[in-house]
């Protein structure tokens, strides 16, 4: 078992380990127990009732966090011609095709998200082994393969503004950063509810029994706080209505 420092242990003493917290209480407590001297990421960890070995039980989707992630998102767009011009005007950080493919093959990965125009996927597809394992590969399911150039500014704006992809890991848990410690409680709650609502909507058809088993929130360095799942799902549904 890893040894924790004094501040971590003191933070843990403020949490009732057997209690399931309502969202408002959890967010308030979370800010109180975050002790690091940097702007920690606020994390949510959702344990799902799925068998990740089964293809029809995979959870993979996106959510637009209404208050963003708290970090600057560098977006790369694989586009040429008119789409290249539109991407640059819409605020893409890197735009091109052949030159970017070559740079990525050489090990360059200084971006946080990637979009590809559909007509460039023939060239981009070969990057799957490099980008796929890092969650950077453009994908139709996540909306990052664009067919109509008129849709490009909207997709780019969503990524810049807080659109993030989530997926289950090999143990059936989804991990997502939903903001920073410097966010207000309303902002953290808003992002939490948006994620939980998106997670509910992403329930796979093959999932049986209880889908959302546990929800835990924490900051980068803090202990976790266990949420009351039914109360959180209900609050997320009300917020989305």
Residue ranges of each PLM-predicted region?
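Conserved active-site and cofactor/substrate-binding residues in soluble primary-metabolism enzymes
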Residues: 6, 18-21, 25, 36-39, ...
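Feature captures the catalytic cores and cofactor-binding loops of soluble hydro-lyases/lyases
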Residues: 84-88, 102
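C-terminal alpha-helical interaction appendages
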Residues: 1-19, 32, 38, 43
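Residue-level signature of catalytic and energy-coupling elements of molecular machines
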Residues: 26, 87, 132, 217
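Positively charged, low-complexity, intrinsically disordered RNA-binding extensions
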Residues: 10, 15, 22, 154-241
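Long, charge-patterned amphipathic alpha-helical coiled-coil/hairpin "stalk" segments used as oligomerization
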Residues: 92-202
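Translation machinery proteins
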Residues: 21-85, 112
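Short glycine-enriched loop/turn motifs at secondary-structure junctions
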Residues: 9-13, 67-73, 88-90, 108
């Amino acid at each position: 078992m890893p040894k924790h420092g004094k501040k971590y242990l003191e933070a843990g003493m403020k949490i009732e380990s057997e209690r399931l917290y309502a969202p408002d209480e959890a967010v308030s407590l979370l800010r109180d127990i975050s002790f690091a001297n940097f702007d920690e990421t606020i994390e949510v960890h959702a344990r799902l009732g799925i068998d990740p070995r089964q293809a029809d039980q995979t959870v993979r989707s996106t959510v637009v966090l209404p208050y963003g992630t708290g970090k600057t998102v560098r977006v790369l767009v694989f586009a040429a011609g008119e789409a290249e011009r539109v991407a640059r005007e819409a605020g893409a950080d890197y735009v091109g095709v052949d030159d970017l493919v070559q740079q990525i093959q050489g090990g360059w990965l200084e971006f946080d998200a990637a979009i590809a125009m559909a007509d460039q996927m023939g060239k981009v597809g070969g990057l799957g082994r490099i980008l796929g394992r890092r969650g950077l590969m453009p994908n139709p399911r996540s909306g990052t393969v664009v067919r109509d150039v008129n849709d490009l500014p909207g997709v780019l704006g969503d990524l810049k503004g807080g659109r993030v992809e989530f997926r289950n890991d090999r143990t059936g848990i989804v991990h997502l950063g939903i903001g920073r410690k410097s966010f207000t409680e309303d902002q953290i709650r808003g992002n939490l509810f948006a994620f939980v609502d998106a997670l509910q909507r992403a329930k796979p058809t093959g999932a049986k029994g209880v889908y959302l088993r546990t929800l835990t929130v924490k900051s980068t360095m803090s202990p976790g706080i266990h949420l009351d799942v039914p109360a959180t799902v209900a609050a997320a549904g009300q917020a989305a209505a």
